[in-house]
C-alpha cells in the first residue's frame, strides 16, 4: 500500500520519560520511544498530497514535532483541541498535569505536498467525555472526513476498526 493514503491519523503510544508518568500507559498497552516511532516507514504510506493528524499531549509536543518531520510531513496547525468532560458527571475531567491540572489534548495537522481541504466549516474544538485510557473521541474521525472528504485513509496505532478506515495497530479489538 505504498503511497496510497491521503489521510494518516495517528495516536502514537508515547513513552513518557518524565518521572511520575513512567508506566501509566504501559499498564494499558505497549509504548514506543521517540527514536523507535521515528523509524516507522509512515512516509511510504502517504500519498504525494496528504495530511497527517497526530495526537499529542502537551508534555510530548517536542517529540510530536520531531515525529512529524521524521515521517516526511510539515507541521501546519492544530487540527483539534479535545476538551475532556467527565465520563459520569457534567463537569470537566482534570488530569494531574505538571504545573497546572491538565484537561485538553491536541491533534496536530501536518501536510505533505499540497492536499486540498473539502470543507471550510470544520471547527477545532471537540468537547466530549473521556473513555477508556487514551481512546480518542469518534468525533475526531468524523471531522477529518468532513475536512478532507472520502479519501483513502488509515489509522495508525488503532484500537478499533471503524468503517471506511484501513487500520494498523496492536490494540485492535478485532482484525
What label would you give each PLM region?
Residues 84-99:
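Short alpha-helix plus adjacent loop in nuclease-associated cores
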Residues 12, 58, 112:
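Residues immediately flanking
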Residues 16-18, 61-64, 117-118:
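Short catalytic/ligand-binding loop motif for oxyanion handling, primarily in non-cytosolic enzymes
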Residues 173-175:
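Conserved small/polar residues in nucleotide/adenosyl-binding loops
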Residues 2-54:
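SAM-dependent methyltransferase catalytic-core segment centered on the flexible catalytic loop
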Residues 143-144, 163-167:
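Conserved GTP-binding G-domain of TRAFAC-class P-loop NTPases and closely related GTPase folds
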Residues 36-88:
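Conserved Class I SAM-dependent methyltransferase catalytic core
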Residues 95-152:
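Flexible, glycine-/basic-rich loop-and-beta segments that form/coincide
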Amino acid at each position: 500500500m505504498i503511497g496510497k493514503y491521503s489521510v494518516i491519523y495517528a495516536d502514537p503510544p508515547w513513552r513518557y520519560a518524565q518521572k511520575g508518568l513512567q508506566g501509566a500507559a504501559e499498564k494499558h498497552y505497549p509504548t514506543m520511544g521517540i527514536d523507535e516511532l521515528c523509524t516507522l516507514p509512515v512516509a511510504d504510506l502517504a500519498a504525494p498530497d496528504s495530511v497527517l493528524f497526530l495526537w499529542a499531549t502537551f508534555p510530548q509536543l517536542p517529540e510530536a514535532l520531531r515525529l512529524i518531520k521524521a515521517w516526511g510531513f510539515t507541521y501546519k496547525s492544530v487540527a483539534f483541541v479535545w476538551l475532556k468532560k467527565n465520563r459520569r458527571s457534567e463537569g470537566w475531567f482534570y488530569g494531574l498535569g505538571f504545573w497546572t491540572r491538565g484537561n485538553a489534548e491536541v491533534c496536530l495537522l501536518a501536510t505533505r505536498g499540497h492536499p486540498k481541504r473539502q470543507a471550510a466549516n470544520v471547527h477545532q474544538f471537540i468537547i466530549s467525555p473521556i473513555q477508556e485510557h487514551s481512546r480518542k473521541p469518534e468525533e475526531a474521525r468524523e471531522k477529518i472526513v468532513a475536512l478532507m472528504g472520502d479519501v483513502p485513509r488509515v489509522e495508525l496505532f488503532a484500537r478499533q476498526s471503524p468503517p471506511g478506515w484501513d487500520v494498523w495497530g496492536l490494540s485492535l479489538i478485532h482484525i
